[in-house]
Amino acid sequence: NLNVGPDTAINLAALGALSPDGRCFTFDARANGFVRGEGGGVVVLKRLQAALDDGDDVLCVIRGSAVNNDGGGEGLTAPDQRAQERVLRLAYERAGVAPGQVGYVELHGTGTPLGDRVEAAALGEVLGAERDPGSPLPVGAAKTNIGHLEGAAGIAGLIKAALCVERGEIPPSLTFASAPWPGGSPALAGVSSFGIGGTNCHVVLEAPPEPRPQATADSQPRDLEVPAERPFAWPGPLPFPLSAQAPAALRE
């Protein structure tokens, strides 16, 4: 994401989405909008069995994910709490993970009064219901540190959460201190990313298996043992949307 022209900034300012303080105060009483950031990220996705066979350095395991859309709701910029709850429940159902096991959630957290409040309520309904009152769920948002990368914000959050579960430490959001990973093994984290058009995405990450195998010249493929309580659930048919300015162009 590169801010090379003024148009997007002008439109966001007119929408009232940008923070006049130039800071992103995610989940903070001072939340008054976000600050735009620049950056990008790339990850290599590989089947776990193939990565283990090849002796790759596995940073995390993607246990499950879900995507939905609430674009038919109250308006373009109005998030839907129930839709966010549904995408969270579906992601953890596909991952075979009880929401109460999650040790950290990387928020979408743009730092807007409405968006943060809705996201907090959805997380509380789904991930807070099964938690011990003495073990609150740590949350954070990379946007407080690097701003909102807009189209690249999701991959930034994914990379941050992957490093969290791999290193067993939660880095600080702006004005906070780092913290050790809460109890529980393996380390599990959730990552949320929401689009302005109503698309909601949540991914469940798990710490890599230990110890990490080293590749050898005579290494042989081997079966990966998946515990019965962690079945793989295929998400079903995936849409391939097409659009055009006219029906004839769409057919072509």
Question: Could you say what each language-model-derived stretch is?
Answer:
Residues 1-232:
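Condensing-enzyme catalytic core of the thiolase-fold
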